[in-house]
């Protein structure tokens, strides 16, 4: 059964890399304040990622999204207070660049610094192997380019993003070239590894897969996004990643596989940390 195609707008390894192995996914728990709101939990997660993983003199990748926002905020605070010095950061979107500049965080690009000490970003889905779906905010290409070059990629999410299998909980974004975009959309929809999904061209703002306009969404790179909606988990994530990447017209996709070093997770019971060195993933 081939994937269906729709034009409707619907809600939609670098050298020296350290990642969490399947046999060594661990967890730890940090209790939150009583009755913390969702934003407060996101803040705690973002702050913890910087407190635990960023040291003076580092090159840091800055993610995009509502949780990554707090990591950028925390980095700015610690630079302003003098607790951190000599930091150079690489943003993964224009939104993040603007936030970082407003906080006085020194920035560069991969052209100046090709290897990062750590990158911090959110995710839309996380499976028990710490594979991710990312790109709901439309920054998947820059996110992957930056984060694949980090020695440590730290993921920050709330527990609603945890899943048994990638796909059903959040559409998988695929960034494509504008040239003959409908041909590319149909080609993606026909791939065996994504059979049964519905391919939807993102409309309105590229920063959300919820329709908010009548024009085709355009990324920071001038490309379009196809969101793949799944009813069942992706059977072979690695195969899907390979087939999508090898499709002519596809720039990149939102499957981040074998990249996560640690996942910091906010939930009603506190902040839990999954990664090498603790208990197996609990979800």
Regions found by a protein language model. Give the residues of each.
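N-terminal chloroplast transit peptides
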Residues: 1-19
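Conserved phosphate- and dinucleotide-binding cores of soluble alpha/beta proteins
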Residues: 30-37, 43-44, 95-283
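Low-complexity, intrinsically disordered segments with a bias for serine/threonine
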Residues: 7-10, 25-27, 31
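Glycine-rich beta-strand-to-loop/alpha-helix junction loops that act as flexible
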Residues: 59-67
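Short coil/turn segments at beta-strand junctions that form active-site/ligand-binding loops
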Residues: 56-58, 151
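Active-site catalytic microenvironments in core metabolic enzymes, especially phosphate/sugar-handling
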Residues: 36-54, 67-113
